[in-house]
Amino acid sequence: MTDKKYFKQVKPFRVPTTDGKLIEEHLGLATTRTPAYSIAHMIAPPHWSEPHQQPEFDEITIVIRGRKMAEVDGEEIILQAGETLLVKSGARVKYSNPFDEETEYWSVCVPAFDINTVNREDE
């Protein structure tokens, strides 16, 4: 980032994935070396899932289109377009899209998403 009091992101970092999910980090460790927060735009394909994790950061999910499931400490929560979920640091969570349509959403992590602090389980 520069000495300016603003930053305009024109080319988010596309995170390489092998599961068909689109992840574009707009602000965070990968793009701006910002450790305090990260924000990413994501599109999860139908029937997508990731392993359980117990992150050391809060994560806010804002669903734009479709539906998304979050299993938080054993409780299943279904989010629809226009809904928001806050999962607090230390919760055991698994995100998925078990539905037949794509899910588009934004994710905000505080502090920033870090592969070393997401604590994904082997499944």
Regions from the PLM with identified roles:
Residues 23-25, 39-55:
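Conserved short histidine dyad/triad with adjacent acidic residue
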Residues 33, 89-115:
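Ligand-binding loop in jelly-roll beta-barrel domains
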Residues 48-50, 69, 85, 89-95:
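Histidine-centered metal-chelating micro-motifs
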Residues 28-29, 49-55, 96-98, 118:
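Short histidine-centered beta-strand/loop micro-motifs
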Residues 67-69, 76, 92, 102:
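Structural motif
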Residues 56-68, 73:
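Glycine- and acidic-residue-biased ligand/ion/polar-headgroup-sensing regions
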